[in-house]
Amino acid sequence: WITRHTGEKFDPGFCGKGLACRSVSYAASMSPCCLSADERKALPELLRNLDALSVREAELAEMIRPLTEKEVRVVCDPVLLLTYEEWERRCIPVKRNRPYVLCYNLMRSEACMKQARETGKELGCEVVEITAILRLTKPGKYCLQALDPISFISYFKEATFVVTSSFHGTVFSVLFHKPFYVVGMGNLGGRSAALL
């Protein structure tokens, strides 16, 4: 439900508009949890299309409850629905010759990259960065930008240490019992703080 990804307005399909079937919103998320005046005005009509509604953040639930007559449930992130063993079975071997510190730097934080470099140096590990942001210059020797979901989780499973600016980076560190460091995420860090 983050409108900056959908042209600064809600995608009606996410709210079941125009679908000829039952529509359920499971574990919708919005980070940061804030609505503009236009979004607050548009959302009640869109929410009427849904047969059931759940969100990941308690803050989001409180924000949208006044906008709908439907019950708004708070549920866990879908990543947490699988156990360690279920995630582990999906993993594949990562082709790395040396132990590595994984830096999942979703927020493009220089502090995150700096912490990863320092931790790598301290542990004698190379630093592998996963980012969705195309970089013109790589901050480290290994910067991965196009991983499929299985490779993505496999890098967490095989890491020596994880440094992250992401909720899902935090979750996979916990699931795979990895030592980790979460770099401050400001007002986007509520879910990570709640998890920890």
Task: Name each model-derived stretch.
Residues 70-78, 126-129, 179-186:
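Short hydrophobic/aromatic-enriched beta-strand-loop microsegments
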Residues 50-57, 163:
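A short beta-strand/loop micro-motif in the catalytic core of glycosyltransferases
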Residues 94-107:
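Conserved donor-binding/catalytic core segment of Leloir-type glycosyltransferases
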Residues 1-45, 92:
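Aromatic- and Gly/Pro-rich donor/ligand-binding loops
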Residues 72-80, 84, 132-133, 137-170:
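Donor nucleotide-activated moiety binding/catalytic core segment of transferases
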Residues 44-48, 156:
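A conserved, positively charged/aromatic
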Residues 171-196:
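Catalytic binding pocket for nucleotide-activated donors in carbohydrate/polymer assembly enzymes
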Residues 24-32, 63-64, 105-106, 111-148:
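Catalytic donor nucleotide-activated moiety binding site of glycosyltransferases and closely related
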